Structure formats: C-alpha cells, structure tokens
C-alpha cells in the first residue's frame, strides 16, 4: 500500500492547478511560462491559453535553448487524457527545467471560462 501512495503522490506532484497559474497571470505573470504543446495547425487549434507560447511537443527538444531556466514552465495539450503534455513535461524535466503539466489541460481551462486568445 505504501508504494501505491508514494507513486500517486509523485504523480500528483507533476501537476499544477489552474488557479495557481491564473493567480500568477493576474499579478505580473513572471513566475510561470505556459507552453501550448499541441501538435496541430493553427486552424485546428483556434484558441489557446492567454499569453501562452506555442511550441509543439514534437519540436520542444530542438527549442530548449530558447527557454530560460528563470521561469517555471507549465505545459498543456488538448485534454488531461492525452500524452503530449506528459511527453513535453518529461523532456523539460530531463533537461533540468522546473516544470509542471496543467491539471485538466486546455479542456479544463476552457471549462472554467478562464482567459483565452486566438492562435
């Protein structure tokens, strides 16, 4: 049972909730940088989280040198059930970036009517 609890605690530690990210956005936006890692053309995406940067998961490894380690990165994809966010998070963590996956992904953000912008 202890191993299951430890595994679940580790799993949950990889996520950040919407409210924490939104609070930073409403202040000065200097703590977190949100990355949209969806591998889709703009016409398919249509919108994204306000002020997020777009780096498709398939291109993230090649663009790591454009990211500063002064920020905490929050990655998201379409829904919490897809793996792009997890793949991107793994890449960031393997390269010593502080990073989290957004709990609920874009679907959860939209469901709470939080700030979006067109792509």
Give the label of every model feature segment.
Residues 1-45, 118-119:
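Flexible, polar/low-complexity N-terminal or interdomain linker segments that lie immediately upstream
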Residues 16, 55-56:
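Short acidic-hydrophobic, aromatic-tinged amphipathic segments that line or gate anion-handling sites
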Residues 34, 52-54, 99-101:
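Conserved beta-strand scaffold positions in the cores of enzyme catalytic domains, especially
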Residues 43-50, 65-67:
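Short loop/helix-cap segments at secondary-structure boundaries that form the rim of catalytic
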Residues 51-53, 116-119:
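Short, hinge-like loop/turn segments at secondary-structure boundaries
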Residues 57-64:
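Alpha-helical scaffolding within the catalytic cores
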Residues 64-110:
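Catalytic cysteine-centered active loop of the rhodanese-like fold, especially the PTP/DSP P-loop
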Residues 111-115:
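Short secondary-structure transition/capping segments
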């Amino acid at each position: 049972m202890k191993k299951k609890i430890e595994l679940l605690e580790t799993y949950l530690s990889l996520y950040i909730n919407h409210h924490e990210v939104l609070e930073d956005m409403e202040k000065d936006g200097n703590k977190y940088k949100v990355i949209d890692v969806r591998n889709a053309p703009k016409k398919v995406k249509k919108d994204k989280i306000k002020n997020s940067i777009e780096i498709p998961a398939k291109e993230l490894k090649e663009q790591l040198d454009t990211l500063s380690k002064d920020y905490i990165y929050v990655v998201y994809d379409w829904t919490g059930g897809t793996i792009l966010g997890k793949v991107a998070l793994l890449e960031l963590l393997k390269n010593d970036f502080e990073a989290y996956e957004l709990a609920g992904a874009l679907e959860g953000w939209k469901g709470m009517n939080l700030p979006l912008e067109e792509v």
